[in-house]
Amino acid sequence: MIERGKYQSLTMINWNGFFARTFDIDNLVTTLSGGNGAGKSTTMAAFITALIPDQSLLHFRNTTEAGSSQASRDKGLYGKLQAGACYAALDVVNSRNQRLLFAVKLQQVAGRDKKVDIKPFLIQGLPSHVKPTDVLVETVSDKHARVRQINEVKDAVGQIEGAHFKSFPSIVDYHAQMFEFGVIPKKLRNSSDRSKFYRLIEASLYGGISSAITRSLRDYLLPQNGGVKKAFQDMESALRENRMTLEAIKTTQADRDLFKHLITESTNYVAADYMRHANDRRNKVGQTLVLRGELFSSRETLIEQNSLLNRVHEELELLVEQESALEQDYQGASDHLQLVQNALRQQEKIERYQEDLEELNFRLEEQMMVVEEANERVMQAEERAIISEEEVDSLKSQLADYQQALDVQQTRALQYQQAVQALDKARRLLDKSELTAESAQALATQLKAEQETRTSELLALKHKLDMSSAAAQQFNHAFELVKRVLGEVARSEAAKQAQQVIRQAREAQNVVQNEAQWQAQQRDLERQLEQQRSVRELATQYHKQHRVVLDDAATVELERERHSALLEELETEQENCREQRGQLRHQEQELQTQIARFESIAPAWIKANDALETLREQSGAELADSQSVMAHMQQVLELEKAQSMAKDKLAERRTKLDSEIERLASPGGSNDPRLKGLADTLGGVLLSEIYDDITIDDAPYFSAMYGPARHAIVVSDLSGIKEKLVELDDCPEDLYLIEGDVDAFDDSSFNAEELEGAVCVQLNQRQMRYSRFPAIPLFGRAAREQRLELLREERDDVVEQHAKASFDSQKLQRLYASFNQFVAMHLQVAFDADPEQALATARDKRNQLLRSISEFEAQEQQLRSQLQASKQALAALDKLAPQMGLLDEETLEARYHELEEKLQQLSEAKAFIAAHGRTISELEKVAAVLDADPEQFDALEQQYQQADQALQQLKAQIFALSDLLERRHHFAYSDSVDLLNQSSELSEQLKAKLVQAESERTRSREELKQAQAQLSQYNQLLASLKSSHQAKLETVQEFKQELQEFGVHADEGAIERAQRRRDELQERLHTSRSRKSEYERTITSTELEMKALVKRMKKVEKDYQDLRTFVVNAKAGWCSVLRLARQNDVERRLHKRELAYLSADELRSMSDKSLGALRLAVANNEDLRDALRQSEDNSRPERKVLFYIAVYQHLRERIRQDIIRTDDPVEAIEEMEVELARLTEELTQREQRLAISSDSVASIIRKTIQREQNRIRMLNQGLSNISFGQVNGVRLNVKVRESHEILLAGLSEQQAQHKDLFESARYTFSEAMAKLFQRVNPHIDMGQRSPQVLGEELLDYRNYLELSVEVNRGSDGWLQAESGALSTGEAIGTGQSILLMVVQSWEEESRRLRSKDIVPCRLLFLDEAARLDAKSIATLFELCERLDMQLLIAAPENISPEKGTTYKLVRKVFKDHEHVHVVGLRGFAQTEKPKTAEQKFAEELAGELTE
């Protein structure tokens, strides 16, 4: 027997009062005894926390919170912990004898919410000698220990061999591990299950009858029949999916036309544009090649004609060049003549102005002398005026101040003495004693005149001396100039060499003046030589081309006649070529007509041929002619009929299998569904239901033993059955009834003997039945399920075969329809000759004709070239004829060389002038000094010294006279000497002098004014003369500058030469223009012939360049289009050969029509609408392909893969026709097969209710002997709700009345159930629940039952268990009994979910057990012992149970630290466990050995 798992211990680490405490959990009852605050509730809280570590559920209330719904903020856990890491660990040994330590790490989280961080973990495989505290607490010293953190715990466990540490990220995983190892009785999948488990623990902890549990006993006691509900949900889901698929098929059938329309129009739209671009590209490439050939031939012809024309133009260009030079020379000569004439007129102006300038110069010199004399007179007048002013002022000051007057008179006396001394000095120097102050002025004037004369003489000598000195310098300068030109020259030869150099320079100037004339003559000779060379080249070229030497005019005339005759002959041959080419053109037009006819019939033939190839692929036949097509069409029709018959047979077999499967799947597997109803009517059970759990091996035996009675009804009593049978309306032909206990039925009533493969049953003394074991037994659920599996496999095979047959039938129908369509549309042309092959032959012939035409055109071109050559020869002869005289002209070269020598001399002369021109110009100015004698310079210098000495002596005399003249007015102060002695008369004399001085002052002022006025007039006249002289001088200089800018030497000979030169050039220009007109008339005919060819070639070249650019630019786009089409596998859809024969306008019209249809078709699809709008850009053809790909992708996405399994929309459209009908039929049948009857639903629900009633009856048996106080028994009462019983009756007995609900496609089965419930219970308000929700509730059997708890209390009998009707102890005991029932129910419910070798732990809690008396506690102990349950209770100190383990808890405080002192006691009334038979045998054996 498998032992139940047990809790071994509870370990608390770092809780309030418990630093590291382990409580051993007794196998029966563990009691925590102590006073208030001792720590009993804390210990239970640690146990519950380790069991359910969900802080959202944990809530440890105390008695002060009895009426509170929220309690304290920390929910009783935060305050029970110490700071730091805390642990609560449960040590468990399960049924497999595995030691498990389920623990949680708790830690307070700082904050006002007082939350606790909980982390669950598991330690598995700890050795038995290792305590939980050894892992969770680290011993630091003998008296100190430290709580380990969870990582340290993990490391410590890792060091223990065989131990494993596992943490859990969620509580669900933690509880799943607990369930697997048998620690908790129920699998807690979610928070709802955890809440139920916690409510159960909480109800156990606080005792009494929990209203939370009694109100929802169905959820706690009745297991959820998930399989039934899931079956219903799966059935509804399958029906819903089936109906959705049917709707999808209808939608797909509607989409089929859209598919066809969209794919047809998009194919037409894109393929037409695709083929239009392909045709256009092919045509453009062909046109490009044709134009390139024509361009190359035209270029060759043009090159030939151009070479001919170039030779003609060379002569014209030469003549034009000569004419241009002549025009330039003529224009230059005219300009030179005009320039010479202008220079002569300018020279005349200069001479006239120079005469005026000389006259002005003479008048200017005279006026300057007059102004000089007037200036001297003004200065003398100013001096006299100043002296008179000073005299007046002096006399006035003397009169004003007598002392001053005396001083003045003394000064004047001194001045008078100095004047007398000056007079004596002048007499001595002049050696004239008679000299007086009055006669000094005349003598001074005389001496001044003499001074001027001597000064002039001295200046003349000075000038001669300077000239002599300058002559010596100029001689040296001129001699240096001669040496600069000629190099080292003797001094005596300097004058001669200078004259020679000047002469050479003049000759060079004369040579340079002939420069223009010689250059013009050179150009004339060059042109004549060039003409001679051109004529000789023409003659040489003509000799090379025609092998004829042109040496005279007669030969030229003969050649002209020969070429004229050749021209006539070539023109005749050219006409013949044109006629033959016209005939070939006619034949080419006939072939073009045939090609057009073939092109017109080719599209229809291509469509017919494609349809024929499709038929051949579909049918796999040759189909060589129309007769074979008709014959094969008949064969397809016969095959289709045969396939339809095979399909019908398979459908019939499938129906039989479905009915048999449905019969075997029904309860009991009865052949007759009425038996179940009869069993309910008679109050019995089908025999097959009783034996429903037998094994497959036993099924043949029991099936043979019961024989025909295997579908009998077992009733508890046969009395009164006959009356009920008589009242039956509908009953099978044979109905077997067997009397027996339904709950404990056996086969003892049958006398059966098993034989070899059979059973022999002795019915009575005279009857015996022999039944062989059936080959396929159907008795028992296992046998039926085995048979069902085989039948379902067979049915799947039949369904697959039927689907294949349906597909083949549809395929044959489609093939027959394709034959019909082919016969109607394409049979007439499908077997005609291939027009494309005939078209290729015709095109080859046409190409041959075109090549022949090209050969004739080439021949004609050759004739034209010969004609052109002859014409060019005639033109060359015409050009040579007038210039034949130049061929033998030999003097041109000699004249040209002579002129080149003159030009060489000219270059040398220009180089000489450029090198020495300036030097020679300077030399020419000073050449005369070379003849002068520089040795006379010394005598002249001595004469100059003597004259200078005499002049200096004269200047000393003049100075003495000047000093005398300056002091002559001082002689008037002779009286001052006397006045110094006669001071009394001084004043009167001063006054007289003042009057005399004032009159003198007035007279001198008038003289000064007259002199100044006269000087002003003279100055004005001088300024006017100077301005006139300056203007004339500037004008002359400007005229000279202009004359110099003319750059010509103006003389009478120059103008005569210029006129003669101009007249000569004018005559030559007239002659050249006449010859140019002749040349232009000669080449006009050649230009006209080339003009047409050039025009044609330019047009062809432009067309070729445009076409080639178009082809090259389109190539990249076309390559991208092809790449897109091939990568997306749409090229075969777009490249339609029949469209290649349509014109571009027809294809464009086709594309535009489809575009209009597509705009309507994609109006509601944004992606396709945008793609279509972008594809309308004709410059981007790849966008149309992208649109086509988008349509394909869109249709692929629209293809339902559950109906059609292909990615190609075109193939999908073809498969739709085949698949839709078959799928519709199959889905309709599947819906009928999936639909469950209301009777079956009622039967399943009733059977489930009956099973649960029996299970609760078994649970009640375990609680029947429980007693708490006056309570002598506890039981659960279960009954079916009246409203739901009416619903079950309506489902099973009134099916016909409710067909509108269950056979309607508008409602699901759940909705039909809800509608039926409302129909049979109109008085019940359904609230806001939807029919679907209500229907799902009605499919759960638990909603049909009502559960209540009843107690047998004293004389009152069985009463409803309510807290108000029971004492506290009775309520606690009753509540514990109910909780035990719930735990036992959970274990039974979860048995199939856990391993068979696991029996889960059972443990309940009870706080404040003092409310129970000793008898009640003993009852609890008995209940725990009987049900193998552990109980953890808390009781005050006055409770001392006799059994189990008791812990005495006392909380002690030492200084600021408190801890709980714990003492454990074993119960004093412990009874030994009963020994097993093996133990007794072992003890007896040990005793015998001892003896």
Curated annotation (Swiss-Prot):
Quaternary structure (record): Homodimerization via its hinge domain. Binds to DNA via its C-terminal region. Interacts, and probably forms a ternary complex, with MukE and MukF via its C-terminal region. The complex formation is stimulated by calcium or magnesium. Interacts with tubulin-related protein FtsZ.
Domain of life (superkingdom): Bacteria
SUPFAM superfamilies in UniProt: P-loop containing nucleoside triphosphate hydrolases (SSF52540)
Signal sequence extent: none
Region: Disordered, residue numbers: 1059-1080
One cellular-component annotation, GO: nucleoid
Function: Plays a central role in chromosome condensation, segregation and cell cycle progression. Functions as a homodimer, which is essential for chromosome partition. Involved in negative DNA supercoiling in vivo, and by this means organize and compact chromosomes. May achieve or facilitate chromosome segregation by condensation DNA from both sides of a centrally located replisome during cell division.
UniProt-annotated binding residues for ATP: G34, G35, N36, G37, A38, G39, K40, S41
Compartments it resides in: Cytoplasm, Nucleoid
GO molecular function ontology, one term from the record: ATP binding
Coiled coil: 302-450, 490-600, 781-806, 836-1109, 1210-1239
UniProt-listed Pfam families: MukB, MukB_hinge, SbcC_Walker_B
Keyword DNA damage: no
Protein name: Chromosome partition protein MukB
Region (Flexible hinge): 667-784
Organism (species): Vibrio cholerae serotype O1 (strain ATCC 39315 / El Tor Inaba N16961)
Record family assignment: Belongs to the SMC family. MukB subfamily.
Tagged with keyword Coiled coil: yes
